[in-house]
């Protein structure tokens, strides 16, 4: 079904969302998602994870190879970078809900071997998946929304948003009281050498420290 040729198989996400959703019921419904063609090659839906009381929601692009196999977001190499950065920034992992704008892994096979190569999701696939993210936002109601990478930032803040120019800025939004965009942790792993990797990690942690400052300066809601 490459290229979305079997449109009749698609089911709008809005038709799957429960009338009175919880994070658990949303995850159960998302397991049957057929909103675009990505479900065909993906192992499973990878829904968001974290407490409904999370003060921070972090949104990436899509699950990777490890996440697709495990069924959990941010458990691969990029997830380990994120966990380390959160710890260095002083953010409690229990205060964080992590998810992606797209819930299925988009990939293509390598020229040789069985390796699955990440491919950036197409605009219509991101749009098809948006209702899941909107439902997550409505339930969690984070104090700070963190967009990890350009796909997440442009999906949530508009196509004109530039992470390069506006990285690390805390901006108000209808989505959350504060929104901050930064790089995706996978970009740190792609750094050409150790020195660059350490430099990019420091910048990433500095961005997350701004989030930590917001949490520290504003009392946690009861």
Listing of model-derived features with the role each one plays in the protein:
Residues 2-222:
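A polyanion-binding, active-site-adjacent surface
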């Amino acid at each position: 079904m490459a290229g979305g040729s079997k449109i009749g198989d698609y089911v709008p996400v809005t038709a799957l969302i429960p009338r009175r959703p919880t994070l658990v019921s949303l995850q159960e419904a998302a397991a049957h998602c057929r909103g675009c063609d990505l479900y065909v090659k993906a192992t499973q839906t990878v829904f968001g994870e974290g407490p409904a009381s999370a003060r921070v929601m972090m949104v990436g692009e899509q699950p990777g190879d490890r996440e697709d196999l495990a069924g959990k977001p941010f458990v691969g190499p990029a997830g380990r970078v994120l966990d380390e950065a959160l710890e260095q920034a002083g953010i409690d992992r229990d205060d964080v809900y992590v998810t992606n704008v797209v819930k299925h892994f988009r990939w293509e096979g390598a020229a040789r071997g069985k390796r699955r190569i990440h491919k950036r999701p197409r605009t219509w696939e991101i749009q098809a998946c948006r209702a899941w993210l909107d439902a997550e936002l409505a339930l969690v109601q984070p104090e700070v929304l963190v967009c990890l990478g350009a796909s997440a930032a442009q999906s949530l803040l508009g196509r004109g948003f530039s992470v390069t120019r506006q990285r690390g800025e805390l901006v108000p939004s209808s989505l959350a009281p504060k929104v901050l965009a930064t790089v995706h942790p996978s970009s740190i792993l792609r750094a050409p050498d150790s020195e660059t990797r350490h430099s990019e990690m420091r910048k990433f942690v500095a961005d997350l420290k701004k989030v930590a400052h917001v949490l520290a300066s504003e009392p946690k809601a009861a």
